[in-house]
Amino acid sequence: MLSSNGWRALVLSLALVPQAVADICATLEAGGIEIEKRISLAYQTDLTEYWSTACGDLKPTCIAAPSSAAEMAQVIKNLHDVETLFAIKSGGHNPNNGFASIQDGLLVSTKNLDQVDYNPEDHTAVIGPGLSWEEAQQGLAGTGRTIVGGRMGGVGVGGYMVGGGMSFLSSQYGWAANNVKDFEVVLANGSIVHATETENPDLFMSLKGGGNNFGVVTAYTMQTHPQDHKVWGGNYVYTADKASEILTAVRNFTDEYPDDKAAIIVTFERSLVIDLCILFLFYDGPEPPSGVFDEFTAIEHTSTTKTWDTYYDLLNHNNFFILKGQRYNIATETTPLPNKTVGTAPLEEYYEHFRDVTGSVLEVAGILGSIAFQPLPKTFSQRAKDRGGDLLDIPSDQPYIVIELNYSYGLSIDDSKVDAATVQLYQGMGNIVQKNIDKGLLPDVYRPLFMNDAYYRQDYWGRISPESKTLALKTRKAYDPEGFFQTRTSGGWRLKD
């Protein structure tokens, strides 16, 4: 089923003169910009690269692939001459229909914006939005440096960055967006500007968690960090009956956070034939010191952890867990961590709610449900503030867990059923959090949503602090006064008064 944004894209595109879209494809091609037409192999290949096959079901009239900021500016300027919607595609990992995909409009691919330019003098790297994170990391091979980026190598740079970006390195350096020194941006009027702490600082802050509301980012100048050593990581796999022990270990790990170089993701998966837990582990060194992961190690498991020669090797290994060829829905909730006295009761409620809702749709062909517990310890939030902050502005005096909810399944005929289950899952999760707050089991604190994991129906801007939303809205009006990106892009969380 198309999302509301996807239907909007489809209906408006069909309502407009189809020739207008064909005209802009021809205009851009005449201007020297790479254009992929529906009959081309490159076009077909691009549509198979989405994480969710539902996004690939949407067929743009053509795909434009600019290779520079100047060419991207040309695309944006030419779009003012026609009445058609467009979408921007980076890695295509966001599964929300219409966010990086479009029916009959113009799809703008950033795949040719794929530079990795390292500057050894200030240890920064210019990273293109068209890269995957494994490509970005591989581009730094031999420098002894790394960048704060995705935990799975196949995730794209572009959308990940403007959504904030959670990393295995976040407890050392904050969100990925906190490590950007300079955004190169094409604005709605086609001008190319830079956003830094001192140049267009309002735009600089708003791009760190503000999505696609302000312009098209064509390059990120990022601070790199030392990593001239091997890293350790991999997976532990547990049976589902160990859930209570695992969640206890998650709570304690997040609360005590024994080492800033350590990171985990705890993912429970359920289908008709699968019922288990996969723990992703990472340590920014050849081997974790004794005590860091001991509580997880003590639970019966199978292990594929090892020392990897490079961070790139680990990210490439993690790609095994990016299952393609399926349709995907994704959603999120943010919960404060229960204290030691309360224990894991709220976490176990979240897990049981996931099992209950998932159990109701197990007859859906090929369905696999997952719930991931992603620690957001106090040190993570403090590092984000130390590096200039962001729109999320999460307090550093309270540990949190970011919950990712996920359904993959096979057939479009089941779209409405899985959509309903997704809504039931995240709404119920939010209700459980609030119930525990009302009972005094969880603190009543600010709980923004993590954009990269959010479902299109969720109210991202309604959960951002009033101060951050006010800043973002002022920024949007200053840099896009006519609301070009609000009305002409086919998806994203709209920033309205």
Give the residues covered by each predicted segment:
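Short glycine-biased active-site loop of nucleotidyltransferases that positions the nucleotide triphosphate
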Residues: W51-C55, N96-I102, K208, K385, ...
